[in-house]
């Protein structure tokens, strides 16, 4: 079946905006490593991270700092990578539903394939044919000609792909032989499905495993297949006989990763039990425990620069990657240094790795403070940090302190509505803004720590300010479209226009390296760019296609959202002896301070005798009016108490805080007033 791939646009889909708070250069894997590829010719190791980043390392042991570069374009876990074209091209598969094609030598993304509709979990590569297959949770397998992929350009951006149908469940593993004549998939269906990729014909279905098939390998001519499963077994299959010919029960738990030597005689296996074994396929009882990792094994890569291999690179759910020496271990069959009594625990032959690609810490816990601006996090090294969501930066490293105590220490009796969500999936803070609540949080400039040029204390919308900062470099946001023509007429001639352009929000900027992601609510990424790059011609064009209207409204059209209103009732307190008023439902901004309600009570209810003196028109302010207002404010605080649930309210508190922390009930907020006893 032929299918065509083109760049998607936002259309009518619900689009969210996300951004990642991080350093400009993230040198270390910040989470588990899902995949490895080794280029022995250049001494380079590629690691595919759960932090969404592919990194390139120099594995020459004499190098003090092995980091070379990062390949960044994915927005979710990178689940698999394959090196093609003698190491020139890298293909990657991600949970962001895309397959990407990279220049492996220069480290940039050449094209993005959006054919999959769900997480892409596995890739397979036929070296002799330069053919790659991709598969994932959408149950689809697509075949890609690598030479066609590397020839894609901005104008020539359509590629035809073949697909293999028939899978009934999510695919987690894939293998293709070097000659490109056989492809095998493993899935939660617990069976192996086999196709001929040349004709896309299904050849057979192999049953035997009792759980998800997580790892697959084929020999060169495609006659034998090895599978590793969450059921804890490794199976060897004869495709000619269409059956399992051997079962290896080496591990205590699920088998997630396999490697095999060139002769297809010895299998290296790892998984949930953290142990890595080498097993002789010709004699299932002959096995050797190479090492024990500190975390479950996700992927292994043999150093094939020599035969037999000299080393095994191992990636786990931790962020460091280890190189274990295996030189000479294939001779263990004749040396007698192995255990063939499976009931006797084996001792690992390696206690320390030869080389470690050190990883960084991953954020594993977070707490959004009740100012709804700052976040406390705890990482895998038990370090606590303090972050500013609005400015997209880390404020302070607090070290190994008590996380819960820090939360208590920073508690304020203030309520701000939720306006963003946090995701820790990549091990870094990813903040997502959604149209449904992005504009829910208003604060005063003073409370936010911002000063206004005219000395006033305007109300600021946190979500609106942030969107303006994230798109500050996008030219379309610089001039209000209503004023654009007038500005050009008035200022171009004298060169003043550039100076007149207002960028951003006028209060703060976010770090220019901040990644900004536009994606569907379901998780599919539409466009990723760095904040500073939105001024580029290509980026501007893609933003025009992708940015949803709710973001355009605030960043381009400068239409601020409306204030949130809160309904409430105002009644005399039972202790005041005053007659209960007619129950009128009042409404005010949820940021209205209690003192303003006290002033209303003093002016309109208690002090009725002077009412005529305090209702002057706001359009015709008279001398002394400001003083009169200040007098009323002072008198109101001296004479009036406002209560909620019989608790006296702080005049500085706002209505939303009263409702959240004190009212705590369904229905409309009810406030009671009384005169202070003298």
UniProtKB/Swiss-Prot annotation:
Q: State the similarity comment.
A: Belongs to the WD repeat WDR48 family.
Tell me the GO BP annotations in alphabetical order: DNA damage response; DNA repair; positive regulation of double-strand break repair via homologous recombination
Q: What protein name applies here?
A: WD repeat-containing protein 48
Name the job this protein performs: Regulator of deubiquitinating complexes, which acts as a strong activator of usp1, usp12 and usp46. Enhances the usp1-mediated deubiquitination of fancd2; usp1 being almost inactive by itself. Activates deubiquitination by increasing the catalytic turnover without increasing the affinity of deubiquitinating enzymes for the substrate. Also activates deubiquitinating activity of complexes containing usp12. Together with rad51ap1, promotes DNA repair by stimulating rad51-mediated homologous recombination. Binds single-stranded DNA (ssDNA) and double-stranded DNA (dsDNA).
Lineage, top ranks: Eukaryota, Metazoa, Chordata, Craniata, Vertebrata
What the entry lists under Pfam families is as follows:
DUF3337 (PF11816), WD40 (PF00400)
Question: Where is the sequence biased in composition, kind Low complexity?
Answer: 610-621
Q: What is the annotated localization of this protein?
A: Nucleus; Cytoplasm; Lysosome; Late endosome
Q: Which GO terms of the molecular function aspect are on file?
A: deubiquitinase activator activity; DNA binding; double-stranded DNA binding; single-stranded DNA binding
What segment(s) does the record annotate as region Disordered? 608-629
Q: Which InterPro entries does this one have? A: G-protein_beta_WD-40_rep (IPR020472), WD40/YVTN_repeat-like_dom_sf (IPR015943), WD40_repeat_CS (IPR019775), WD40_repeat_dom_sf (IPR036322), WD40_rpt (IPR001680), WDR48 (IPR051246), WDR48/Bun107 (IPR021772)
- Which Gene Ontology CC terms are recorded? late endosome; lysosome; nucleus
Domain of life here?
Answer: Eukaryota
Q: Where are the WD repeats?
A: 28-67, 73-112, 115-154, 166-205, 208-247, 250-289, 292-334, 358-397
């Amino acid at each position: 079946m032929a299918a065509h791939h083109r760049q998607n646009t936002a259309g009518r889909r619900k689009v969210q905006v996300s951004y990642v708070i991080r350093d400009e250069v993230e040198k270390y894997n910040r989470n588990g490593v899902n995949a490895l590829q080794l280029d022995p010719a250049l001494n380079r190791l590629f690691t595919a991270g759960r932090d969404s980043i592919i990194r390139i390392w120099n594995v020459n042991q004499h190098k003090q700092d092995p980091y070379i570069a990062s390949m960044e374009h994915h927005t979710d876990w990178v689940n698999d990578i394959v090196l093609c074209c003698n190491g020139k091209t890298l293909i990657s598969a991600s949970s962001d539903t895309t397959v990407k094609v990279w220049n492996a030598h220069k480290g940039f993304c050449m094209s993005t394939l959006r054919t999959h509709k769900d997480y892409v979990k596995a890739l397979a590569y036929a070296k002799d044919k330069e053919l790659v297959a991709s598969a994932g949770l959408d149950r689809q397998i697509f075949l890609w000609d690598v030479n066609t992929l590397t020839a894609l350009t901005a104008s020539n951006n359509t590629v035809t792909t073949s697909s293999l149908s028939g899978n009934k469940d999510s695919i987690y593993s894939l293998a293709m032989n070097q000659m490109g004549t056989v492809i095998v998939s493993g899935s939660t269906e617990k069976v192996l499905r086999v196709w001929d990729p040349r004709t896309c014909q299904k050849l057979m279905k192999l049953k035997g495993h009792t759980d998800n098939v997580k790892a697959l390998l084929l020999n060169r001519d495609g006659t034998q297949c090895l599978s590793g499963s969450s059921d804890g077994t490794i199976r060897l299959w004869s495709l000619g006989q269409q059956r399992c010919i051997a079962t290896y029960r080496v591990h205590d738990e699920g088998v997630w990763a396999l490697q095999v030597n060139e002769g297809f005689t010895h299998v290296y296996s790892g998984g949930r039990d953290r142990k890595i074994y080498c097993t002789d396929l010709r004699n299932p009882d002959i096995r050797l425990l190479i090492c024990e990792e500190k975390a479950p094994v996700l992927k292994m890569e043999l150093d094939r620069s020599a035969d037999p291999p000299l080393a095994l690179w191992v990636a786990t759910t931790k962020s460091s990657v280890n190189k274990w020496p295996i030189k000479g271990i294939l001779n263990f069959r004749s040396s007698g240094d192995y255990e063939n009594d499976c009931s006797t625990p084996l001792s690992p032959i390696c206690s320390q790795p030869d080389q470690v690609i050190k990883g960084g810490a991953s954020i594993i816990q977070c707490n959004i403070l009740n100012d709804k601006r700052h976040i406390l996090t705890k990482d895998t090294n038990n370090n606590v940090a303090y972050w500013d969501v609005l400015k997209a930066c880390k404020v302070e490293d607090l070290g190994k302190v008590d996380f819960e105590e820090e939360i208590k220490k920073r508690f304020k009796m203030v309520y701000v509505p939720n306006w963003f969500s946090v995701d820790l999936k990549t091990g870094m803070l990813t903040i997502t803004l959604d149209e449904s609540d992005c504009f829910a949080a208003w604060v005063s400039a003073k409370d936010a720590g911002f000063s206004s040029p005219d000395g006033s204390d305007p109300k600021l919308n946190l979500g609106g300010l942030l969107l303006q900062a994230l798109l500050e470099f996008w030219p379309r946001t610089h001039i209000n479209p209503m004023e654009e023509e007038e500005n050009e007429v008035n200022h171009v001639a004298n060169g003043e226009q550039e100076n007149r352009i207002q960028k951003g929000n006028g209060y703060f900027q976010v770090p220019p390296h901040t990644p900004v992601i536009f994606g569907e609510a379901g998780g599919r990424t539409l466009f990723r760019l760095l904040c500073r790059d939105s001024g580029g011609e290509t980026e501007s064009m893609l933003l025009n296609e992708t940015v949803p209207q709710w973001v355009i409204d605030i960043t381009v059209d400068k239409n601020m959202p409306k204030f949130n209103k809160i309904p409430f009732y105002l009644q005399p307190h039972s202790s005041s002896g005053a007659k209960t008023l007619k129950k009128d439902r009042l409404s005010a901004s949820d940021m209205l301070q209690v003192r303003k309600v006290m002033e209303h009570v003093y002016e309109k209810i208690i002090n009725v005798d002077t009412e005529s003196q305090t209702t002057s028109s706001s359009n015709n302010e008279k001398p002394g009016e400001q003083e009169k207002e200040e007098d009323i404010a002072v008198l109101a605080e001296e004479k009036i108490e406002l209560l909620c649930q019989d608790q006296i309210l702080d005049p500085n508190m706002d209505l939303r805080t009263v409702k959240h922390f004190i009212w705590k009930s369904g229905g409309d907020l009810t406030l009671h007033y009384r005169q202070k006893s003298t």
